[in-house]
Amino acid sequence: MKRIQTFLLTLLLLTSCLSRVSTPEPTPTTAPVYTGTPTPFQPPTETVTPVVAQEPTATPLPRPARALILSIDGFRPDAIELTPMRNLGALMDEGAYSLVAQTIFPSSTLPSHSSMLTGLCPDKHGVNWNDYIPNKGYASGIDIFDLAHTAGLRTVMVVGKEKLRQVTEPESTDVFEFINDRDLVIAARVVELIPQGFDLMLVHFPTPDWMGHKYGWLSPEQYSVLFRADEALQIILNALEGAGMRDDTLIIITADHGGHNTTHGSRRLEDMTIPWIIAGPGVKHMVLSTDINTTDTAATVAWALGLPIQPDWDGRPVLEAFGLPDEPHIQPRCP
């Protein structure tokens, strides 16, 4: 079913491109230029056509050349105030953010990442398991990687948990790498991939979740690995800068869920509340007042890259981050 949806999406994109090619652009008219010379008297039998002043056009927003989503597994937003995360803080100062965004229920890694990238609530994408179970297949619906790959964009995923293979089909990623290691090791691999180019990349840091399960959320041990995650972020930002890609890359940093004690998955605020930070071309500096859900991540990336937002998506683009009026939610929030 999902392959049929992707095929129809390809036909839609091709039809849109052909219609744009076949329609000739109108020839612009040039208003007469005032030279400062007095206009001679015109006989009353001649008609003078008034020149209508044109309304000033709004400056178009700069569009990013690419988008990078960094998901920090198990990252509670209240940890930001308790952990020295200088690089994350710099992005917050540069861009827009919310520290009260919400994930979906169940607040677990695989269902949440599926909602993050498909823009759908769990009852639509169907991922209700949280382990790597290949025979269960993939999340249903057209996800952001399907859209990007169908449009001819280069798509990359570098993740620290193998179960994230089940978010999207293999043919929707040009590069998929599972690295069962620390965040700094994952970042080092991302640095090697950046010069090869990408249009859409997901990077997943697993270590904060591991430490939360072992030592507890907001434990000293988790603070320590969040500090390392910030160092890993710096490595990626430096690589983008070195490749001349930093200024035209849209960056979203978020999480799949939070946690309490040594667990998560419930509807408790500690489990459901996540950070949502965005920086890059066109993004204004502000604390976002918009009600943000993890499903909005896919819609925001699609909007920024000029990809078609799917009508059945529950998420919508966070336009407030770009200084624009937010669109109302057509779909209700996830139950």
Label the predicted regions.
Residues 7-16:
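Bacterial N-terminal signal peptides
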Residues 17-62, 329-335:
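Ser/Thr-rich, Proline-interspersed low-complexity disordered segments
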Residues 62-76, 90-92, 116, 148, ...:
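Beta-strand elements within well-structured catalytic alpha/beta cores of enzymes
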Residues 63-64, 74-196, 303, 316-321:
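Active-site-proximal alpha/beta segments of enzymes that process anionic O-linked groups
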Residues 68-69, 87, 225-268, 301:
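Metal-dependent active-site segment of extracytoplasmic phospho-/sulfohydrolases and closely related
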Residues 113, 117, 267-308, 319, ...:
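Substrate-binding rim/cap in mid-to-C-terminal beta-strand-loop elements of soluble/periplasmic
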Residues 163-173, 195-231, 235:
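Active-site His/acidic residue clusters
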Residues 307-335:
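Polar, surface-exposed loop/tail segments
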